[in-house]
Amino acid sequence: MDTKMEDVGKTPEPIRFQTTTEPASISTLDGWIENLMACKQLPEVDVLRLCEKAREVLHSESNVQPVKCPVTVCGDIHGQFHDLMELFRIGGPNPDTNYLFMGDYVDRGYYSVETVTLLVALKIRYPQRITILRGNHESRQITQVYGFYDECLRKYGNANVWKYFTNLFDFLPLTALIENQIFCLHGGLSPSIDTLDNIKSLDRIQEVPHEGPMCDLLWSDPDDRCGWGISPRGAGYTFGQDISEAFNHNNGLTLVARAHQLVMEGYNWSQDRNVVTIFSAPNYCYRCGNQAAIMEIDEHLKYTFLQFDPCPRAGEPMVTRRTPDYFL
């Protein structure tokens, strides 16, 4: 979401884990999912098992992961677990509904641990029914500043769960392609990328770089001005309608669907409908007053937007933020 690269410090070294635990059975996974749906966190040892299995599943996926219709496309969640439950109520439960999430599962909301653990568990349990992409907040650097690291310390008493998940984030696909026509990603386009094959050739299994094509895919934004521009975020670029039109034409696409920006109605068309922004965290940061939306795409590639408001809040935890919130 609205994050600036200058807010983060030096990139820590990725932590690599050897598989030392027994794989989870389907019945075990179902038990985990049942608890997670009730907003109950898993024990640390089970989070490790979950992340080890998820790494195997995600490693087999492409940088441009193919997705079939029907599918429901979702934007930022940002740890707003109870609003994720409302999303599933509106859109239908997984696996009955196929889902594509475009990143930013953690930070800012109070339930990043439960949110990302549930989505990863669903990915393992129903790998063909849910696609989870990487957002700019699925990063060691960003999560140390915007909440996920502190939440893991608070809920587990150490940083191990944060390490397990941030190691896993390196394996998340960067983009998805729905029926070879709708291109989905978290941020936006890159001056270093002309074709989808350019994306397929990237080495994604790393911390998000400060610059370059992988960074741009997770950080860039559409803009009213033509051409490429310097992003006020300090990472990625802004891109104009001429850029998105050419990219869609050259790659046989009908649409770029992306997240990354707060839009007050939950979705927003731009650049002569070459780009749509989807944001799925209602009343973002518990104070912005925005609606959220998801995009349902049927078997004929027809899309419908479902908007929803935040679910009622009750008993939010008392959390002291280390850093002030900001908005672009």
From Swiss-Prot:
This is Serine/threonine-protein phosphatase PP2A-2 catalytic subunit. Its cofactor is Mn(2+). GO terms for molecular function: metal ion binding; protein serine/threonine phosphatase activity. Mn(2+) 2 binds at residues 104, 136, 186, 260. The modification Leucine methyl ester is found at residue 328. Coiled coil: none annotated. The active site is at residue 137. PANTHER family: SERINE/THREONINE-PROTEIN PHOSPHATASE PP2A-RELATED. Keywords: Hydrolase, Manganese, Metal-binding, Methylation, Protein phosphatase.
